[in-house]
């Protein structure tokens, strides 16, 4: 979880916030007709509202609390997905499809197999899939959609706060990053993944 928290802290910095949670006026997105302008690039309206939700949450709770909340949210969901796939309840979307550490969920999307998702996310992933170098960005959109569409995760953890979707770490797929460690951990055996205690943790 500390690995996730460090990645989330770095991601918040890239979104314009300093270590105290302050943000300069020039780093705030500007809502425009049909989208938002941020750092010289055009984004969807959804990004604007997620960014503002993050800003408001930091003002209300403080940046350290937001680090904790986002790390807790992603840790729980990613570990739960691993448990579900180890018990053959869902396809192994987090596992790698190749030596380049491309997750299966991304590989399947490149073949036209997308999880259920809202239309704005669908448009976003279609654009991203045109660029094979944007694996992490593709993974982030697909993972968010997968979490929203999965009834078990929804029942166990509820709906994610919208700002949390922005905070999946940029190094999530790096060598020795969280997904890499989750896929290759020796701390939990295959037998333990099927234990009632670990499955019970979901509930």
Feature roles, as predicted:
Residues 1-203:
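Preference for the N-terminal adenyl/adenosyl cofactor-binding alpha/beta module
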């Amino acid at each position: 979880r500390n690995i996730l928290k460090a990645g989330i802290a770095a991601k918040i910095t890239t979104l314009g916030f300093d270590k105290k949670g302050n943000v300069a006026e020039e780093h705030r997105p500007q809502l425009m007709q049909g989208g938002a302008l941020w750092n010289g690039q055009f984004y969807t309206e959804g990004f604007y509202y997620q960014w503002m939700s993050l800003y408001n949450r930091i003002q209300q709770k403080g940046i350290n609390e937001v680090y904790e909340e986002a790390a807790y949210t992603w840790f729980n969901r990613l570990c739960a997905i691993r448990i579900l796939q180890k018990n053959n309840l869902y396809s192994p979307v987090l596992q790698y499809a190749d030596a380049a550490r491309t997750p299966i969920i991304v590989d399947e999307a490149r073949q036209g197999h997308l999880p259920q998702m809202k239309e704005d996310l669908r448009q976003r992933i279609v654009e991203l899939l045109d660029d094979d170098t944007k694996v992490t960005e593709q993974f982030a959109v697909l993972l968010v959609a997968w979490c929203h569409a999965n009834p078990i995760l929804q029942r166990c953890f509820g709906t994610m706060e919208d700002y949390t979707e922005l905070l999946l770490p940029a190094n999530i797929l790096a060598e020795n990053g969280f997904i890499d460690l989750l896929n290759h951990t020796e701390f939990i055996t295959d037998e333990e993944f099927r234990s009632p205690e670990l499955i019970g943790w979901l509930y």
